[in-house]
A protein has these predicted regions:
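Extracellular low-complexity Ser/Thr/Asn/Gly-rich intrinsically disordered segments
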Residues: 1-351
Length: 351
């Protein structure tokens, strides 16, 4: 089994590449709502006014004292890429002649939700000045959920068509690229060509950035591998290597450095996910490939808060690492043996 480990995390987003929505992420079983939100998804917060037609003011805060001596003293959370996204509506504005129900719409970021729990609270506050006299205010407590996920699927090597989650793919080992006789050693030297494997990685329910890491299992001694990523689903541009090409040893993982990836500003609902695309280039070299070899690319990731991706089915930490996998098989080339009636083939150089 071929296992290439892509670990390491780099804080900077590589070369300005930003990811857009591609394949849909796997569904999650987490139940979310405005009081139990997930990062990157818009939520409505609303309240019924009686009588209506007064003035409303919505704001969020982590303060536990809201009003002192008749004046607002809570520290309001401003809109920004690391708090509440600027797409918020009816937020921190005085809305006159308010209708009932009144509402605000906000998208929480991963950063502002980090560490929020019952003892480190977050609130959405509504202040209401009635149309005739006096005022009132009410508070919603927000207890978020970490629903950050990362999934992986195969892309068909001929045509670059994404396959369904869990669908395997296969291709033949490449044809021989070169063959020559090496006079000093009296041996044949074969180059068994290059195979390229393609994958899509989908991250969802986060803001800011995510940093993936990978394992790839199955490479054999004599093969070399280069792992690259891009946000271009056609693989025509932006390919960036995750470290240098490395030589494989049967049964030994290879390590590559991961890179932080940000979603495109055009993506406003991160529950739909964003995608990066992975190309794995295998140089077979002296490895002949006389057996079917299963290659498994697995992925993990952390969000901008260094929180790991969850298990889609349980919404908890996975039972094991690198549980999101995609499998492809390199199908064996034919075996050719010498006929004893003729004699022996020229000995070949082995890995």
């Amino acid at each position: 089994m071929l296992l290439v480990l892509v670990t390491g995390m780099v804080a900077n987003v590589a070369f300005g590449q930003t990811a857009v929505t591609g394949s849909a992420p796997r569904p999650i079983s987490c139940s979310d709502d405005p009081l139990h939100p997930i990062a990157g998804k818009p939520y409505d917060y609303s309240a019924i006014l009686s009588p209506a037609a007064g003035s409303t003011y919505w704001y969020a805060t982590k303060s536990t004292t809201f009003v002192t001596a008749g004046a607002r003293t809570a520290t309001e959370i401003l809109t920004s890429p690391t708090t509440i996204l600027s797409s918020a509506t009816n937020y921190r504005v005085v809305a006159t002649n308010a209708t009932s129900p009144t509402k605000t719409n906000v998208t929480w970021t991963s950063e502002i939700l980090k560490g929020v729990d019952a003892t480190n609270p977050l609130f959405m506050v509504l202040e209401y000045k009635g149309p005739t006299c006096s005022n009132n205010m009410k508070v919603y407590q927000v207890l978020p959920k970490n629903a950050f996920t990362v999934d992986i699927l195969n892309i068909k090597s001929n045509g670059l068509t994404p396959l369904a989650y869990g669908t395997t793919d296969s291709q033949c080992y490449a044809d021989i690229a070169s063959a020559k006789y090496d006079a000093p050693t009296s041996k044949m030297v074969y180059d068994y060509g290059i195979n390229k494997l393609y994958f899509e990685v989908v991250a969802a329910n986060f803001t800011g950035s995510f940093t993936p890491s990978f394992t790839l299992s199955g490479l054999k001694t004599g093969q070399k591998v280069l792992v690259e990523w891009t946000v271009d689903k056609t693989f025509a541009s932006g390919l960036t290597a995750l470290g240098a090409e490395q030589s494989a040893t049967t049964g030994t993982p290879l390590n590559f450095a991961g890179t932080a990836v940000s979603p495109s500003p055009t993506v406003t609902d991160l529950t739909k996910g964003v995608s990066i695309y992975i190309r794995v280039t295998v140089k077979n070299g002296l490895y002949e490939g006389l057996t079917d070899d299963k290659l498994v690319l697995a992925v993990e990731a952390v969000n901008i808060n260094n929180e790991p991706d969850i298990d889609n089915a349980t919404c908890a930490a996975p039972a094991s690492t690198y549980e999101d996998t995609a499998e492809q098989t390199l199908n064996m080339r034919p075996t050719v043996n010498p006929d004893p009636a003729t004699g022996a083939f020229v000995v070949q150089t082995l890995p």
